Amino acid sequence: MAKISILFMGTPEFALPSLEILVRNGYPIAAVVTQPDRPKGRGKQLVAPPVKIAATSYQIPVLQPPGIKDPAFLEILEKISPDLIVVAAFGQILPKTVLDFPPLGCINVHPSLLPRYRGAAPINWTLIHGETRTGVTIMYMDEGLDTGDILLQEETPIPPEENFGILHDRLSNLGADLLLRAVRLLEAHQAPRNPQEDSLSSYAPMLKKEDGLIRWSEEVSTIANRIRGLSPAPGAYTFLNGKTLKIFAAAGIEQSVPGQPGEVGKLTDQGLQVTAGNGYVVLQDVQMENRKRMNVSDFLRGHKLSTGTVLG
């Protein structure tokens, strides 16, 4: 029996395992739709999205419409006529004309346990809020923001040492495995469909710069979770002598401490102690504005930072 034809829509690295698992398992990818190339770096050279690079290596046709409602794209969609559309971190909301097109519908790989953490940045906010469990949901797409019925869902614990980068990669691979199971169920016309419980929903909006600002009066666990939820990118930050200091790794020690919030204490084997609301945050990896990321011991060799200096 011939496998179903799939139109794949995705853009960043998160989507790569999902595309790759479909290709490896012999599913015909009619085309890949991804965001346009964007200028990056100091030279502002155009850089292709990771999914475009992967699709080109597989010799899959790539479409980069300026907008998903572009009439030219809709014409191509009619010509391609896929059985199923698979979406993984595409970056645009799909209109009803696209959602209604494929006979098997549109499904999305979402890195949270829906209905919790609907939105653009679920992995970041899951960590920032100190959750100990998360997962991946394969959902049928509708016109809402991650509100469609659930096809499959898998839960996984979050170890305390995992940051955004580690959890991102783990969920992208978990999502790919779950996607393959979902596609096979759809192919066999055995896919379940369970409505989300809207009363349990929460949102994970797109990150803003101020979401990375460390408030030293907060509890150490709150600060440590913000740091891990934004590491390695975009990075939680504070200020030192008017310049941005990004913090990528830190630990929290809850104890009664002297000094005001943000006050620099001593350097220990674990890192540099900074006073917070209910203890110390111990800085381990940092990056000064316009400098490279480094461990805090190397940083202190190049920056004179005396005890009593206040960050923020």
From Swiss-Prot:
Residue sites binding (6S)-5,6,7,8-tetrahydrofolate per the record: S112, L113, L114, P115
UniProt keyword annotation of Hydrolase present: no
GO cellular component: cytosol
Known function: Attaches a formyl group to the free amino group of methionyl-tRNA(fMet). The formyl group appears to play a dual role in the initiator identity of N-formylmethionyl-tRNA by promoting its recognition by IF2 and preventing the misappropriation of this tRNA by the elongation apparatus.
Organism listed in the record: Syntrophus aciditrophicus (strain SB)
Family membership: Belongs to the Fmt family.
Stated name of the protein: Methionyl-tRNA formyltransferase
A Pfam cross-reference name: Formyl_trans_C
S-S pairs: none
